[in-house]
Amino acid sequence: QVLANVYSVKSGKPLFAPYHIIDKQITATGPDGKAITSTVKVGIISFAPPTIMAWDKRWLEGRVYTQGVRETAEKFIPEMRARGAELVVAISHGGLDDSPYSPTMENGNYYLSQVPGVDAMLIGHSHQLFPNAASTVPQFNLPGVDKARGMVNGVPTVMANLWGKHLGVIGLRLRHDGKQWVVDKSATTVEARGIQNADKSYVQPDPAIAKLVAEEHAA
């Protein structure tokens, strides 16, 4: 459970852990062409839309306060890198908007993508599908947004529509620069996979995931 930009009024500290760094085992091809296994340190950081303070004022006012997405990322991502994160994935409940930046803006991810050190973004809130080459929504035609490849200012980004209709998948292609693993953006893929086939039948559920969510589905 991570949330970087919501703070406790009482303590002045983030309400939850702002980020977490996990070790992921990968299989790669070594310089000699042979398969090797390696560990990649992946940092995960998340953000809520600061406008929760207006939407849920009756419950939140006097208890918590928010910081802007951009300045929060600028604070914690260097710290994550200093603690060994080779990759940083930002999970942000917001969409894209190129209005002048404000710490209270609802959809601040266009600016989040410009913070150095963000390797991938999982975004949402505006209930749209990204990447989507056919989309005509203005925010997917902003400068630096590649709606076909799923890039926002060069950062691989996915928005998986709404109500579980799609599964957002970012396939980060990694290479080792001699010191650590880095993202090869030219070979990275982004897609939002629909849960329905062309004939309107549904894809088969993943057994492991189905087991994890069975109780919630039955509720």
Give the ranges of each region predicted by the language model.
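Non-catalytic terminal accessory segments
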Residues: 81-83, 180-182, 190-219
